[in-house]
Amino acid sequence: MRVGITLPQVGEQATRANVIELAKTADKEGIDSLWVLDRLLWPLKPQTPYRGTHDGTLPVSAQRVFDPIDLLTFAAANTEKIKLGTSVIDMLFHNPVILAK
């Protein structure tokens, strides 16, 4: 079985130190892959409440999202053999030459 994990990319846990620690630990412990996502938009007037808060509003900290390509580049610079991937990416918002690398 292969195991992959998501890098801390959104909210309060998305810090430089957390990304480095998780990427290095995953690489050292034999995790197969690290994953990121692409999030461009946030709902202004959601039709359903967010279940992660008492009042149903999306926390401001959750609106901070690291760019997926930048985050993968950062993870690659801090690991040796782990595979990297995107679970979701909006190709129209990224340079095709950069994505092809």
Residue ranges and their predicted role:
Residues 91, 97-98:
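Glycine/small-residue-rich loop that forms an oxyanion/phosphate-binding "nest" at active or ligand-binding sites
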Residues 1-78:
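N-terminal beta1-alpha1-beta2 module of alpha/beta enzyme domains
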